Amino acid sequence: LPGTVGTITRDDLIKFHQAQWKPGSSALVFVGDVTLTEATAIAKQYFGSWSGGAAPAFTVPPPQPVGPGKVYLVDRQSAAQTVIAHILPAPPRASPEYAAVTLADAVYAGGGFGTRLNLNLREDKGYSYGVFSNASLLRQAGAIIASGGVQTDKTTESAAEFMTELKNLAGAKPITDPELTAARLTKIRGYSQQFESLNRVAVQVVGLWALGLPMIELQREPESLLGASLAAVNAAAAKYAAPAGATLLLVGDRSKIEAGLRQLNAGEVVLLDVEGRPVK
């Protein structure tokens, strides 16, 4: 936020750099036609004098749910459409539920155009050009985030369909074998594309290092996606996709969509400005 950035001084940046940029908390990744011996020599040549150990350990507090029944509305006057998003808490990347959550999300909206939410809003109702989601499972916590732009005059109906599809995923309409098979194929085929270039390989390695996971996870990823059972995927969906745990965020023309959102009865409507500050 501007109010926060404005208080940061040059001395603050220097202190942060000195405290956090430490060799013991860093990784140097080489990908290409280079041997370990050559890479080690290069690292010593350019970073051999870098000393200082590791950065101070710190603990990030677990995320606290905002509570059910929250709908945040950001007013953008004369907006051509409304962007709808929701966020649901999810487990960290190291969780044994990782594959099941990933596949449940792929059925919901994270697996391309043939997913439930996208088929509903794009193909069936024509309210949107596309709605997608992503299961972002990080080191200490995760989230399932879905978003998409919809017609302004169909904002209320679209928001209702977001919640309906979450309810369906959480158990009202369990995931089927064909849906799970399609989700597996999408994720496994997409995973292979993450190794199409040297840069992409480096990104995968750095990502695992940042998550505190062993490099063997590069091999285990497709195996875990293949091994997750239908029962496990439906259990993960029931646990993490319940609409009561979702926080809705809408960005659009308040004058055209607020009344409908309040009639939706999805929860308290909280007005925010474009910087995320509450509007009275």
Residue ranges and their predicted role:
Residues 39, 117, 158, 236, ...:
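Hydrophobic side chains in well-ordered alpha-helices
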